[in-house]
Design a protein with these regions (language model features):
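Active-site-proximal or metal-binding-adjacent scaffold patches in catalytic folds
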Residues: 1-93, 102-134
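Walker B catalytic acidic pair
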Residues: 98
Length: 134
């Protein structure tokens, strides 16, 4: 993680959530924008783009999820996000959370579980002002 990029992202997050009243409605453009910000600052632009991004009215017991299709050639990764979040902070934290799963699947060839690889990002998230939970 580059410190200068991380500081810039931390300032951006603080500014965005300062007057966050909610609910927050998301769309593809905003997802792409925040994906680029987080990928640059936290993952050093290593993450591949999702092959498909779906915005859903509801997900069973989740605020977002990554679907991995490792048997396909090439491997495919899809992101599913909710259309409406309680706050913009919830949206940003959910997207960043799912980006860790993408990192696990695409770069580490990991299971994508909430394991030590997943939680190794907790200090980075804390530095930029985000929480990391299951």
């Amino acid at each position: 993680m580059r410190r200068k990029r991380a500081l810039k992202l931390r300032r951006k997050i603080r500014a965005e959530i300062l007057n966050d009243r909610g609910p927050y409605l998301t769309n593809r453009r905003v997802i792409d924008l925040w994906f680029r910000y987080i990928n640059r600052a936290v993952f050093d632009n290593q993450l591949p783009n999702f092959h498909k991004i779906l915005i859903k009215k509801w997900l069973k017991r989740a605020m977002g999820q990554v679907c991995a299709y490792p048997d396909k050639n090439p491997k495919r990764f899809e992101l599913e996000m909710l259309k409406k979040y309680r706050t913009k902070r919830d949206f940003i934290e959910t997207l960043a959370h799912e980006m860790i799963h993408l990192y696990q699947f695409a770069l580490k060839k990991d299971t994508g579980n909430h394991n030590s690889t997943f939680y190794s990002f907790r200090p980075r998230f804390k530095f930029i002002g985000l929480g990391l939970s299951q």
